Curated annotation (Swiss-Prot):
Belongs to the universal ribosomal protein uS4 family. It is found in: Mitochondrion. Its main location: mitochondrion. It holds the Pfam family S4. The keyword Acetylation does not apply. This is Small ribosomal subunit protein uS4m. It comes from Dictyostelium citrinum. The keyword Ribonucleoprotein applies. The gene is mrps4.
Length: 325
């Protein structure tokens, strides 16, 4: 009677545990540890119920009761769900949650910064690049900068990556004379990007005239597009005659002299490169882009401090977290 009561208690407890476990589909390490601990406790209570073998007598067939069969089924189900379950009870360890949270949050912030800078890039693409170029993390950024959508953005032909992807999807862009259909296609050194002839080419020329040409230009030269190499455009930025009325001559002269000195001092520092970075060669007249060299980290301007050997390694730590996308 005592044995039956104990077994009925085990069965009820096991069914409750199985009901809790079956609600969740994915099993994490913590949940598997809970299963293994429960199995350990069940076994610890079941083993003393088994009859010990007597030495010197013939073996007889064991009579299995219905309750023992139930217990075997429950234990088999637990082993199937758990997979590799530990035979021994797992000991609890003290963990500093503050350290783990700080490490995880810093990595998550870096991932979000990269994602804002390289829009439409998912964690899977970062993982593939990290597996390929593990140890040389600087090459990962070079590969990201060689993409067609990023080169169009760096050259100044496009305002955002979304616009670049739209042009590629609508088949307006050519690479070495062939239509480019994949925005994530990486270019090689010597490849040339051009724009397909059509209505969009004229719209792009009209938009580039407003951006590249200075405001103070004679009318007979407005139809031309200059081939800029590196030209300081600060002197075309200010138009003081529009700000001040003709009566305020003293204010105009004082401000003009002060700004003239300031421009001479900061002429070398403040320069707008119409051609974009050094690893690209651009002709705005023909609307062509060619990749001369592999991009360097010094040529790229990031909104945050870039240490690829430290900052890109967070991708390997985020592999476990499937919810992050």
């Amino acid at each position: 009677m005592r044995i039956r009561k104990n077994i009925t208690k085990f069965i009820k407890r096991a069914y409750i545990d199985m009901g809790e476990l079956k609600q969740v589909k994915g099993y994490t390490k913590t949940r598997l540890n809970i299963i293994s601990n429960k199995v350990f406790l069940l076994k610890q209570e079941l083993y003393p119920l088994k009859k010990q073998k007597k030495v010197g007598k013939l073996k007889k067939k064991r009579v299995t009761t219905y309750t023992r069969k139930k217990l075997k089924r429950i234990l088999s189900l637990l082993f199937r769900i758990g997979g590799k379950i530990y035979r021994r009870k797992i000991k609890k360890k003290k963990i500093n949650l503050k350290k783990k949270e700080e490490h995880f949050t810093n990595n998550l912030i870096l991932y979000r910064l990269f994602r804002k800078f390289y829009i439409n890039l998912k964690l899977k693409q970062f993982k593939r690049l990290y597996k390929k170029y593990k140890g040389n993390e600087k090459i990962i950024i070079q590969q990201l900068e060689k993409r067609i959508d990023m080169i169009l953005l760096r050259s100044g032909f496009v305002r955002s990556i979304y616009e670049a992807r739209q042009l590629i999807n609508h088949k307006h862009i050519l690479v070495n004379g062939n239509i480019a259909r994949i925005p994530s296609y990486t270019l090689n050194v010597g490849d040339i990007i051009s724009i397909k002839e059509g209505s969009h080419k004229q719209n792009l020329i009209h938009r580039l005239k407003k951006i590249l040409l200075p405001k103070v230009v004679p009318e007979h030269k407005k139809n031309l597009i200059h081939r800029f190499v590196s030209k300081g455009m600060d002197k075309y930025k200010y138009n003081y005659k529009q700000k001040y009325q003709p009566n305020d001559k003293a204010k105009y002269q004082q401000n003009y002299k002060y700004q003239a000195k300031r421009r001479r001092e900061s002429k070398k520092k403040r320069r707008i490169r119409a051609t974009g970075p050094k690893y690209l060669e651009i002709s705005h007249a023909l609307l062509l882009i060619s990749l001369i060299e592999e991009p360097k980290l010094t040529a790229i301007k990031y909104p945050f401090t870039l240490q690829p050997e430290n900052n890109i390694k967070f991708i390997s730590l985020l592999n476990k977290y499937k919810r992050i996308r």
